[in-house]
Each structure stands twice: as C-alpha cells, then as structure tokens.
Swiss-Prot record:
EC number: 3.1.21.10
GO cellular component terms, semicolon-separated: cytoplasm
Sites marked Transition state stabilizer: K98
Protein name: Holliday junction resolvase RecU
Keyword DNA repair among record annotations: yes
Cell compartment(s), UniProt: Cytoplasm
Gene coding for it: recU
Amino acid sequence: MVNYPHKLSSQKRQPSLSQPKNFANRGMSFEKMINATNDYYLSQGLAVIHKKPTPIQIVRVDYPQRSRAKIVEAYFRQASTTDYSGVYNGYYIDFEAKETKQKRAIPMKNFHPHQIQHMEQVLAQQGICFVLLHFSSQQETYLLPAFDLIRFYHQDKGQKSMPLGYIREYGYEIKAGAFPQIPYLNVIKEHLLGGKTR
C-alpha cells in the first residue's frame, strides 16, 4: 500500500515482546499532572500555586544560528527549596513532589538537608507544608505532611528509604481524577485543616 503524501510503502510491524504498556496517565509525568492540577485550581479560583523556578547561572551559550541559541554550560546558583508554593484560602502552601519506580519505599536520599530545613521553617510560620509522593509502578499517590517526613528524616538521618507502610500510616492517599488530576486540596481541607477553610 502506498501512503500519501510521501509514497512510502507500508510495512507490517511485528508485535513487541516487551511488557504491556500502562496507559493510566497517557504518558503524562507526575510533574505535568501536578502542573495541570494547579492550572485547574487557578482557573476555578480555588488556589494560586505555582512551580518555583530553579535559579541557574548561564556560563556558556552557543549560537549555531542567529535565531537558535543553545545553552551548553550552566550551574545552579543556589540549592532549591521545594518544588511548589502558593496560597489556598489565605493559607500559605509549600510542597515538594517526588516520584519513584520502587514498589515498597522511597529513598530518603531524594530529600536534601536544605529542603528539610526549609520545611521546618515553613511549619514554624504556621504554613501548610507537605510532600506529594507518587509510586509510578502502582499508580499510587500520597500526601505526606511535612511533620511526618521530617520526623522520619531525623530518625535515620536521611540515610534509609521510607517504607510505603509508613507513608500509608501517616499520609493520605490521593486518587487520581480528571479535573483536577491530583486533587490534593481535598486532602488539605479535610485532613490538615479539619474540614474548615477561612
């Protein structure tokens, strides 16, 4: 058969012998799902939460063409704190998002001392601080309050992995939806604010 417009003959593809594909999120990364959720919250007037930019210092740029600049060398200016921050009903929100392919735990090496210190400072100012944890192999997402993350971090000095059992005991599972995709404000309202808002 000839395919228009390139007139290439089609060839039958051999089926792949690899593992079956998981189309649960249709290729959307966890970060993109959070960003889409935040866009939904903003469009509905529910919250203003944005991803924090990572400050970088550009060192070298190549210009292969006048209109196509390419950054070839850059460095982080400073250690970043958490991924997202904003406001929900007058409450300051600050959170980190982590995704793992592991089935039973999340490595604590994914959390850096400056992030833990930042979370402690947010909690000291009465902010709402937490981490969203996504286990991609099981398609499970949890909101773990920063207090419980910090407690575990200090127990093992950030060396081990946090077991899924601990996360299930102290965190709150978030079932993925359509709009919003990761409805974490529901957990904040029901569990962290006791069902009330200002």
